[in-house]
């Protein structure tokens, strides 16, 4: 963002917006008048029927800075269908409707609220502070991407949000591996008419490995098992909470594994995030139930709890779709969105190319979005044997044609696909390194032990063809690997290309250790994408089967197994 653009942006958010950016992060009180802010209801009037008090807990997660309605993919009758969902103004209207029906409502967001769009990058997340504050959330959990602008900026952004923040496993790093105090408060209690609901929060402890290490420099993460039992005891026995909810940004597999661990005994529900899974029926595990409400503001998770004489007597969970066409945008929120984006709108909406097919990133193995990225890299660097791209999950679909009959790809959509404009980096590796790396990457996605699953979907590649068994034993998944039309030669040296990760060792590329002759190019991912699209004008990025799963459908939509769950 240029200095002039920044000045213009700061003018648009106004004095109130700046105040919220600089507001200190005080611990919120738990009385009703501090929790509820809706002007539409009598805050002291309980929703009762036949002596039953119903409390409603609402959750959003992984919105990834998608401020306007967008195309969304649904899997129905074994095929992809698309509908318009989300948008903060539409979401605000929807939430107000839910709060009006039941004023006894507590709204949480479980992370990835400051990363995922061009507007976020241009303003280093600041544009989203007034948006989130206007949404009247009651509690936040930082996600794995809240550190994208560094620790200090994360603290400033989270601290500018008026509602409290909870995270029970992020500590200040005092140096030499010494752990300091918690960065955020460890728990929060909502008390309503004598009923206490306690909230804990755990974000992904693997952030320093999953993302560029320098993003989370200065932070020590711990596994939930290290202090979970202690804080459950505090909430259950000291604070006498009737219900304990864990806010989590660990991924559905990890959340299920945790809910089956004895340390989780005493947690009623895990409100999960990170993997963008859509849990429509709570997953019952040994000690807790697990839910996760999708991503991009397309859904709201709703848990209703009935109490009689202070005792929990019934519970109901729904995954609610935010159907944008049927929701009138909230006028106040719409004004905030348009004002905050005004300085950058022309560039965000600038069309750089077109696709003839829908663009999405929901399949575990291969997707059109990733195919387009790989095609662009391969076009720019034809001399490289294998081009690689991370198995990212974020980015909503883009499926709506314009007047040309094709689907426009804007500059803003490039940011949606690739929020970090990383430098393109090349290196050399042996066939043995590739073979070992492939097995490790596949185990990260499909490990039988859910607690060992790590990161996003299957790594994406072009120049190499791999057939694999998703559910084979570790180290035995790859059945065939071909590079340049020939079987992978473990003694041969191959050239590879991927994105640079800030803070990685000089001899590491795309999590492959010990690479040789690694060097940065003069190109970034965004420059390559824009050059490719403006040159080709119209593309058809159909996946070519570079990765083929032999024991599951190529349209696999989740890495979760062993429980009653399907993505749809």
Question: Where would I find each of the regions flagged by the language model?
Answer:
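Catalytic centers of hydrolytic enzymes
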Residues: 36, 44-94, 100, 129, ...
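Acidic, metal/ion-coordinating pockets
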Residues: 2, 6-323, 364, 368-376, ...
């Amino acid at each position: 963002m240029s200095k002039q653009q920044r000045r213009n942006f700061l003018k648009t958010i106004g004095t109130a917006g700046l105040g919220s950016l600089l507001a200190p992060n005080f611990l919120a009180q738990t009385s009703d008048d501090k929790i509820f802010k809706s002007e539409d209801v009598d805050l002291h009037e309980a929703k009762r029927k036949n002596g039953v008090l119903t409390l409603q807990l609402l959750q959003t997660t992984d919105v990834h800075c998608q401020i306007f309605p967008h195309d969304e993919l649904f899997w129905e009758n074994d095929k992809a269908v698309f509908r318009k969902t989300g948008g903060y103004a539409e979401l605000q209207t929807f939430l107000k409707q839910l709060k009006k029906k039941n004023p006894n409502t507590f709204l949480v967001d479980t992370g990835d609220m400051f990363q995922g769009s061009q507007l976020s990058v241009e303003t280093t997340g600041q544009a989203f502070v007034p948006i989130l504050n206007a949404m009247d959330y009651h509690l936040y959990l930082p996600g794995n991407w809240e550190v994208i602008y560094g620790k200090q900026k994360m603290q400033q952004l989270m601290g500018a949000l008026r509602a409290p923040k909870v995270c029970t496993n992020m500590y200040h790093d005092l140096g030499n591996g010494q752990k300091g105090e918690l960065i955020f408060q460890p728990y929060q209690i909502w008390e309503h008419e004598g009923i206490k609901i306690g909230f804990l929060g755990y974000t992904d402890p693997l952030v320093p490995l999953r993302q560029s290490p320098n993003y989370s420099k200065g932070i020590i993460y711990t596994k939930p098992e290290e202090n979970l039992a202690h804080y459950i005891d505090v909430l259950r026995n000291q604070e006498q909470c009737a219900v304990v909810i864990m806010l989590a940004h660990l991924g559905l597999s990890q959340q299920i594994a945790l809910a089956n661990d004895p340390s989780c005994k005493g947690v009623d529900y895990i409100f999960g995030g990170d993997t963008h899974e859509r849990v429509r029926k709570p997953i019952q595990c040994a000690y807790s139930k697990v839910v996760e409400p999708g991503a991009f503001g397309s859904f709201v998770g709703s848990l209703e709890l009935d109490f009689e004489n202070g005792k929990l007597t019934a519970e109901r969970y729904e995954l609610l779709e935010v159907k944008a066409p049927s929701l009138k945008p909230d006028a106040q929120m719409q004004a905030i969105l348009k004002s905050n984006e005004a300085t950058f709108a022309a560039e965000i909406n600038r069309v750089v190319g077109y696709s003839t097919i829908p663009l999405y990133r929901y399949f575990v193995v291969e997707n059109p979005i990733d195919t387009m990225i790989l095609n662009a890299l391969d076009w720019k660097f034809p001399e490289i044997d294998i081009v690689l791209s991370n198995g990212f999950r974020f980015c909503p679909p883009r499926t709506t044609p314009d007047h040309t009959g094709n689907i426009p790809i804007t500059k803003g959509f490039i940011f949606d696909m690739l929020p970090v404009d990383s430098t393109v980096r090349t290196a050399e590796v042996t066939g043995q390194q590739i073979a070992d790396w492939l097995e490790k990457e596949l185990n990260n996605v499909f490990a039988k032990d859910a607690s060992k699953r790590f990161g996003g979907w299957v790594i994406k590649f072009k120049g190499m063809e791999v057939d694999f068994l998703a559910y084979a034993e570790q180290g035995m998944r790859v059945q065939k690997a071909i590079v340049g039309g020939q079987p992978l030669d473990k003694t041969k040296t191959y050239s590879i290309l991927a994105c640079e990760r800030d803070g990685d060792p000089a001899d590491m590329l795309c999590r492959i250790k010990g690479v040789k002759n690694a060097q940065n190019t003069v190109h970034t991912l965004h420059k390559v994408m824009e050059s490719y699209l403006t040159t080709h004008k119209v593309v058809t990025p159909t996946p070519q089967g570079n990765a083929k799963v032999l024991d599951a459908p190529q349209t696999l939509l989740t890495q979760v197994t062993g429980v009653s769950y399907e993505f749809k």
